[in-house]
Amino acid sequence: MSLLLDTCVLLWLADDPRQLPERVRTQLGPNGPPVHVSAITALELGIKVARGKLQLPLPVSEWFPALCQRNQLHILPVDASVAAASTELPDIHRDPFDRILVATALQRSMTLVTPDGAIPRYRGLVTLW
């Protein structure tokens, strides 16, 4: 099993891991499975910062890779296959960032770590929360 983190989960991991359920914290610990984040998460964070909805101590271009390195998170690229697959998903979730995460998790057989109640409705997707 490999995990893929939703953007909010990454932020809680960075700021206050106690906001994460115990079963999630256990999986994100040193004895847990490999943990990944999508490159699309950096874009989502940058947009939130630019719109004033999020403050980070460093520019996203520095903060995101440093956080990933510190927490041993693997950054996954968004390729054409994932981008196209995200457009072919059922219209359960309209957020394009979440659709990219769902498509990534489905294509790579990963567990998506998310509190979003709509995301588990995608057939074949495994989630953790």
Language-model features: locations:
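Alpha-helix capping/helix-boundary segments
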Residues: 9, 41-42, 82, 101, ...
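Short acidic-hydrophobic, aromatic-tinged amphipathic segments that line or gate anion-handling sites
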Residues: 75-76, 127-129
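Short, conserved active-site loops that position catalytic residues or coordinate cofactors/metal ions
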Residues: 39-44, 78
